[in-house]
């Protein structure tokens, strides 16, 4: 099984506002950069979109380490999602889960992979995270 590191980030100018997502995929010596943007979005949606887009590029099951500076993504996918699904995509307070479309897409995208979700402190000199941040900001610039 191939081993991949994914560094993902989202950015938003205004929240909601113009946003971008970016991801760096690293497999051994090979790297791939991806990014994109949306005009009317939130930082959390862009954080989720970055991981979804990166995972959807993988053509076969892989061992993946996802590095994200978003506790929303890291805790959501590794802790909260189980309860949400059990409650029919409702929170513990019985409210609809925010960004449910993207959470469902992420749940589907991660299903065939073995994934370790790692939180990294943002803007702290972590090379992969800094590159993902730069890609997310490029996504903001191209948002249309």
Swiss-Prot record:
Coiled coil: none annotated. Gene3D superfamilies: Ribonuclease H-like superfamily/Ribonuclease H (3.30.420.10). Its cofactor is Mg(2+). The keyword Kinase does not apply. SUPFAM superfamilies: Ribonuclease H-like (SSF53098). Mg(2+) 2 binds at residues 9, 133. Mg(2+) 1 binds at residues 9, 47, 69. It catalyses: Endonucleolytic cleavage to 5'-phosphomonoester. One of its GO terms (molecular function) is RNA-DNA hybrid ribonuclease activity. Its EC number is 3.1.26.4. It holds the Pfam family RNase_H. InterPro entries: RNase_H, RNaseH-like_sf, RNaseH_domain, RNaseH_sf, RNaseHI. The keyword tRNA processing does not apply. It is found in: Cytoplasm. Keywords: Cytoplasm, Endonuclease, Hydrolase, Magnesium, Metal-binding, Nuclease. Binds 1 Mg(2+) ion per subunit. May bind a second metal ion at a regulatory site, or after substrate binding. One of its GO terms (biological process) is DNA replication, removal of RNA primer. PROSITE patterns: RNASE_H_1. GO terms for cellular component: cytoplasm. Residues 1-141 form the RNase H type-1 domain. HAMAP family: RNase_H. PANTHER family: RIBONUCLEASE H1 (PTHR10642:SF26). Endonuclease that specifically degrades the RNA of RNA-DNA hybrids. Monomer. Belongs to the RNase H family. This is Ribonuclease H. It comes from Janthinobacterium sp. (strain Marseille).
């Amino acid at each position: 099984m191939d081993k991949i590191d994914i560094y993902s980030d989202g950015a938003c100018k205004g929240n909601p506002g113009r946003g971008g997502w970016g991801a760096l995929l690293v497999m051994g010596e090979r790297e791939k950069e991806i990014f994109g943007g949306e005009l009317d979005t939130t930082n959390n949606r862009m954080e989720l979109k970055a991981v979804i887009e990166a995972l959807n590029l993988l053509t076969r099951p892989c061992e993946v380490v996802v590095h994200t500076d978003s506790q929303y993504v890291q805790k959501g996918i590794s802790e909260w999602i189980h309860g949400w699904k059990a409650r029919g995509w409702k929170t513990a307070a019985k409210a609809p889960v925010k960004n449910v479309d993207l959470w469902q897409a992420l749940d589907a995208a991660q299903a065939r992979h073995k994934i370790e979700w790692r939180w990294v402190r943002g803007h702290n000199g972590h090379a992969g995270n800094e590159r993902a941040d730069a890609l997310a900001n490029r996504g903001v610039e191209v948002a249309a």
